[in-house]
Swiss-Prot record:
This is Small ribosomal subunit protein uS12. Keywords: Methylation, Ribonucleoprotein, Ribosomal protein, RNA-binding, rRNA-binding, tRNA-binding. With S4 and S5 plays an important role in translational accuracy. The gene is rpsL. It comes from Chlorobium chlorochromatii (strain CaD3). Part of the 30S ribosomal subunit. Contacts proteins S8 and S17. May interact with IF1 in the 30S initiation complex.
Length: 137
């Protein structure tokens, strides 16, 4: 507990909060150009080939961003939109690429959670394909 004299001399120090996505510079999203698109493996105990891209943002910062969903059309020089959001089992990946915006296509044949993957609503006349995991066994 500080004395009154110590408070007069030094004052209270304000806690500085650290942002989880510093490259966005307080913006909700940022545009960037893919410099490298590749796959990487997650930390233990998980096992997969996660799709990621190295992106050079409009503010000249280079970050690693995750490509969500099944299949993608990204390659070098593709223009993408990134948002914050880390991938827990990929160290150093603190951003997500927004599907369905700029050069990134939406996920094909996506029926549920479509807005998160940039998928358009299926046509009303088209026959509904059976959804995996749903139905009788």
């Amino acid at each position: 507990m500080p004395t009154i004299q110590q408070l007069i001399r030094l004052g209270r120090s304000v806690k500085v909060s650290k942002t989880a996505s510093p490259a966005l510079e307080k913006c909700p999203q940022k545009r960037g150009v893919c410099t490298r698109v590749y796959t990487t493996t997650p930390k233990k105990p998980n096992s997969a080939l996660r799709k990621v891209a190295r992106v050079r943002l409009s503010n000249k910062v280079e970050v690693t961003a995750y490509i969500p969903g099944e299949g993608h059309n990204l390659q070098e020089h593709s223009i993408v939109l990134i948002r914050g959001g880390r991938v827990k089992d990929l160290p150093g990946v603190r951003y997500h690429i927004v599907r369905g915006s700029l050069d990134t296509s939406g996920v094909a044949d996506r029926k549920q959670s479509r807005s998160k993957y940039g998928a358009k609503q299926p046509k009303a006349g088209a026959p509904a394909a059976p959804v995996k995991g749903k139905g009788k066994k």
